[in-house]
UniProtKB/Swiss-Prot annotation:
It comes from the Bacteria. Its EC number is 2.8.1.13. The keyword RNA-binding applies. Gene3D superfamilies: Adenine nucleotide alpha hydrolases-like domains, HUPs, Translation factors. It catalyses: S-sulfanyl-L-cysteinyl-[protein] + uridine(34) in tRNA + AH2 + ATP = 2-thiouridine(34) in tRNA + L-cysteinyl-[protein] + A + AMP + diphosphate + H(+). The gene is mnmA. NCBIfam families: PRK00143.1 (NF001138), trmU (TIGR00420). This is tRNA-specific 2-thiouridylase MnmA.
Length: 374
């Protein structure tokens, strides 16, 4: 017997892209009562005075009309500024490299938007993220990696709570990106051939360095090797991240070998950028980290130890770790030394296909000694 979904209202976060368009289409085809909502999170008028959000909203309207669903626009610019952008700036100010997408999902898409959807009578919200939701026999929701390994977005969803996941659907989780495009083209959706957006949501195609300098004045300083050799001037610590290769302007200067130069450390108090040669420079390697803002996707004890795998950046294979959790903090010990563990980035825990949750990296250690990364 077919399930009658018509009494279940799903509010879809629609960005004007192909993924969220197909999300709305699939739910409509499955018989749900679907409403589309466009979130305006940033005043993003480009240098020609064209507001790109207006163009995206037109695409949302076109797709919603095509599939026959009502649609609305909601303005979250204030919430986004207060909860995501201020955090983003504060992290850069403190010498860290934040991941605003993780915070945007936690605070906007699955908090501000979820709350708004409830005022529309939603039973669930849905987005075009590549992740899967599975309910067990006890009604507990588990978040699994998206089937398309190259598109899996659980890393960015790792701060979601059980309460948030209970109200969430990810209709694209079992599909490959190529299948999603094919569905859009077959249905003749207005967004079928639209290219994927890249970069941080509020910077879009803008030059990151220029963008950041509008909000944080850059302080130039010295670029040094770990053993104290002066390598010239850096443009401002906020422009560099641990393990970065390009943009140092010292490619022609050699040490004792011809290996490329990398950012291997920062000293915020002295405004010094440390550089070293070699991808696996010893200063880039660490054996453990401290993390805070620890969030698990289901209820867990206040203190426990967990053996699992982890990712320390988005496109990276899993590594075996032991996690010692105490309330909202954790010490993560690596089975093998790891390269360029970056304060401000997310550490995300996995058990096979399941994403267990994660936290924000505060400090990396090498054999118990803090690494000079901030």
């Amino acid at each position: 017997m077919m399930t009658d979904n018509s009494k279940t209202r799903v509010v879809v976060g629609m960005s004007g892209g192909v993924d969220s368009s197909v999300t709305a289409l699939l739910l409509k085809e499955q018989g749900y009562d679907v409403i589309g909502v466009f979130m305006k999170n940033w005043d993003d008028t480009d240098e020609f005075g064209v507001c790109t959000a207006t163009e995206d909203y037109k695409d949302v309207a076109a797709v919603a009309d095509q599939i026959g669903i009502p649609y609305y626009s909601v303005n979250f610019e204030k919430e986004y500024w207060d909860r995501v952008f201020e955090y983003f700036l504060a992290e850069y100010r403190s010498g860290r490299t934040p991941n605003p997408d993780v915070m945007c999902n936690k605070e906007i898409k699955f908090k501000a938007f979820l709350d708004y959807a409830m005022t529309l009578g939603a039973d669930y919200v849905a987005t075009g993220h590549y992740a899967q939701i599975k309910r067990d026999e006890n009604g507990v929701v588990h978040m699994l990696r998206g089937l398309d390994k190259g598109k899996d977005q659980t890393y960015f969803l790792s701060q979601l709570s059980q309460e948030q996941l209970q109200k969430t659907m990810f209709p694209l989780g079992h599909l490959q990106k190529s299948e999603v495009r094919a569905i859009a083209e077959q249905a003749g959706l207005a967004t079928a051939k639209k290219k994927d957006s890249t970069g941080i949501c509020f910077i879009s195609e803008k030059n990151f360095k220029t963008f950041l300098s509008h909000y944080l004045p850059a302080q130039k300083g010295r670029m040094m090797t770990v053993d104290g050799r002066d390598m010239g001037e850096h443009a401002g610590l906020m422009y560099y991240t641990i393990g970065q290769r390009g943009g140092l302007g010292i490619g022609g200067q050699q040490g004792g070998d011809n290996k490329p130069w990398f950012v291997v450390g920062k000293d915020l108090s002295q405004n010094i950028l440390y550089v070293g040669q070699g991808f696996y420079h010893e200063s880039l390697m660490s054996t453990s980290l401290d993390a805070s803002v620890i969030q698990f996707t289901r209820e867990v004890p206040e203190e426990f130890t967990l053996e699992c795998t982890a990712k320390f950046r988005y496109r990276q294979p899993d590594s075996k770790v032991t996690v010692h959790v105490k309330k909202d903090k954790a010490k993560v010990v690596f089975a093998e030394p790891q390269r360029a563990i970056t304060p401000g980035q997310a550490v995300v825990f996995y058990d096979g296909h399941e994403c267990l949750g994660g936290g924000i990296i505060d400090m990396a250690y090498k054999d118990g000694e803090p690494c000079q990364y901030i």
